[in-house]
Amino acid sequence: MPIEITLERRQLPLTSTEAALAKGATSRHALRRQFDRAIAAKQALFEPAGALKVDEATLRWSIHRYSEQLVPDAMGQIKFFLSLQRPFYFEPGFAPLFYFTHKSGVQGFSVSKSAVSAVSEGVGAVILQRVMAARILHRPINDFPDLIGTAAASGSQITTSKLYLMEVKGTCMRSVAEMQQTLAEEVFRLAAFTAAAQDLEPARAMVGVLVGVVIHTVDRFSALLIEVTL
């Protein structure tokens, strides 16, 4: 089954002053407020960037290969949760835990956050390879960011090519506007990390990529990308 991922992108170039604010704000809250004001003043909006068609088998492999979540059949768990969002009724006599009606206005269960994270990380890996045209070098475990990729076309160019530092956030059945707010709160951390990485490797370009994945249905996702450049 093909999955359609609608893309929106936002470019966020940082000046040297803004990069310094991001690094300093990791330990000084006053600088964090200055950084937030500087970013808000840029008025950069998300722009439509087309859509990706990804086969479910490809996404499942990407989840298995690049997610740090120990979740058996993450896609299956998402599908099960979404199936209960339709008008669906169990036979009388079942325990209340298994009785659900979307009309009641009360949701007594929630989707597995680990499954959402796993699927989102798999989507992030697909985007890094197919949208950014990068090769994945490393998947840090229990560390930041989620994925590191290179724009190198061959092995001989790895030491000088552009590096992509990708962090992925995910949610299920929430609005795109809510994800935009989440990314606005998270972009500071990625900006600080990207600026610090650039100081350590001044000879190559660093690009921080913050991805927000929204799972609407089993075959329709949205992905918001903020690209931090220096």
At which residue positions do the language-model features occur?
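Interdomain/boundary linker segments immediately adjacent to catalytic/signaling cores
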Residues: 41-118
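Conserved alpha/beta core surface patches that mediate binding of polyanionic ligands
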Residues: 140-152
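N-terminal alpha-helical "arm" segments
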Residues: 1-46
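Conserved catalytic cores of phosphodiester-cleaving nucleases, focusing on short active-site segments
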Residues: 147-149, 156-174
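Catalytic cores of nucleic-acid endonucleases
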Residues: 170-230
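Eukaryote-skewed repeat-based solenoidal scaffolds used as protein-protein interaction platforms
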Residues: 129, 146-149, 167, 181-184
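Short beta-turn/strand-loop junction motif enriched in small, turn-promoting residues
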Residues: 133-134, 152-155
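Acidic-basic catalytic patches of nuclease active cores, encompassing PD-(D/E)XK
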Residues: 101-141, 195-203
